[in-house]
């Protein structure tokens, strides 16, 4: 990338789900060049591609071989199953996945340059988040690409860290406790309140204050 800015990199997205949508939009807003979006769902591929001014495809064999960076954001099982097809003919580009629970070495033996870019946040397509405050954790099989991924992540977020696969696995587990388990408690609370004809909205000030406290006090 000597003599060129990182925004000049051509980026292809494999996946157009919640995380991919938010990450692609964030990169696009910062001036990065998204050249293609792949999703097996035509509507998802088209919607994201139009937003970031990219081409789209629903066929793995039609994924461009010209991108410099491929960002894979698929469900874990689909990623593992499709990995050989995804990288075929594009083994010399830089490949990263965005999963918290999948180790970096899943790429080993498939591609030359690889890593992880893990934004630790809960995402939905309908709700855009402030990437500037999202912790992003990076890892790569080369120091040069670690720095490249840090530079890319730093264009989006003020909070960029290098983390090993083992550390990231623990981060992901902690995130599940913090987010998924909490949301399940909300569901149970909502069901209980509904049973007795009470509104869940009554819980919102309590939820908000509990969340605010953790910013100032130890859990």
Regions found by a protein language model. Give the residues of each.
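Rossmann-like NAD(P)(H) cofactor-binding subdomain of soluble oxidoreductases
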Residues: 42, 52-128
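Short phosphate-binding/catalytic loops that engage adenosine nucleotides
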Residues: 32-33, 112, 158, 198
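Phosphate- and divalent-cation-binding pockets in alpha/beta enzyme and binding domains
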Residues: 22, 47, 81-82, 106, ...
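NAD(P)+-binding Rossmann beta1-loop-alpha1 motif at the extreme N-terminus of oxidoreductases
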Residues: 2-57
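Internal alpha-helical scaffold of NAD(P)-dependent oxidoreductase catalytic cores
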Residues: 9, 44, 48-51, 128-215
